[in-house]
């Protein structure tokens, strides 16, 4: 059996056809239904002229349809393409054009944007509309359920581990780029993650999967996962769905389109969830508030099934982790550090196992390299760029120059340099400083925003914070904190600056503080530094 998502999932569907694979609100799909519906979609794609390496774009909110359409693309050896549902016309057109998309599956509420760009996308052969109450805006679109009903399931294929898998970056460091992987490498990585979560060793070969899945199922120990982050980004999709489905588990997606802590906890309770995947403090705090509110009204949530919470992509502070453990003490909290371009390391926090914010155990294949090409010595206090080895992509789709800059060979080993900087502690752990393109140069000193954000959020009354640099005649750039406060907080600029100076060197402390009602973040919780910088510039009287 080849290591390929579609092939592994087909073997699971054959082994446990009647077990639930997908849940969205009241809609539940068994593994047999999941497999059959994806096979019908694959047949529809092929009937429209798509085939091996064809790109199927998914302009969808979280839900069963996202995963079914993705599986359908995998089945025909196509390439599913994630599309940010926040994109407006030009962003949408850019990504679909750049990806060479031949099919587009979209929620009808997003149809007005689709209608305005499709005439500029001559490669699009097929449009499939998922009805969410606002249909009929795209004349050429076929209804999702009609497409499934109109096609018999596609016969299963022999696939190659060399097939391309691709995920588009969020565009936080420029225009979105498609990061390409061998699907065999990608599936192998995530095949290794789900089984330890249910107490089993990972399979050494995909042919072992059906027997392991049967063992898990018979023991009543299936991995039920809730991705609270959007499936259009790697954290929600990879950690929230691939990990569970490769172990024969179920994925429960939320029906709300903005994060509601009560919905997350209620869904975890009702589905006996084992795993919740989220993104940092911004997604954890609403869960903590919801837990407390339910307890105060005398109707606490039963979260006894919950074993693990995984976060990736942004800062997850020690203080917030401890608050979560105070309420759900049996949890293992896994803070994974990495990017679309590669995995770097992780941090585990449990009751009795403390952790330090931004300090991670690095993967054995991770190095930190100085500007002159040396490996950073542990305990030296030198700063270097993180080089992630092991799981390294093929490159960026249609961008050989950026591929050559990002994916480099050192001493015969290929590494990914995504732009993250770190120090190496004496014990070999990584002290993450942040993304290099966000570094603030103030008075000749380099200031990493994440370090200042962490310190700012420790000041009583601060709910959230982003730190940016604003042009300054004296310092070049002035460190500026964009801050939102907790309800009823009585905190001013001087208190925040003083609070940071008690924790960090004076040159790192904000010189200005801009107060906003809410910190700008993407749906996956990642920082929107562009908007934060605009807030800071506006406050300083600059455009």
Which residues make up each language-model segment?
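Gly/Ser/Thr-rich phosphate-binding loop
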Residues: 171, 246-247, 273-278, 289-356, ...
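AMP-binding/adenylate-forming catalytic core of the ANL superfamily
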Residues: 87, 93-94, 102-106, 389, ...
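Conserved AMP-binding/adenylation subdomain of ANL enzymes
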Residues: 187-227, 232-277, 290, 294
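Conserved beta-loop-beta connector loops within the AMP-binding
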Residues: 367-387, 426-427, 489-493, 527-528
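Conserved AMP-binding/adenylate-forming core of the ANL superfamily
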Residues: 18-63, 71, 88-93
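Conserved pre-ATP/AMP-binding loop-to-beta segment of ANL
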Residues: 150-168, 174-175, 198, 214-224
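Structural core segment of the AMP-binding/adenylate-forming
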Residues: 47-48, 78-146, 158
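AMP-binding/adenylate-forming catalytic domain of the ANL superfamily
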Residues: 130, 505-527
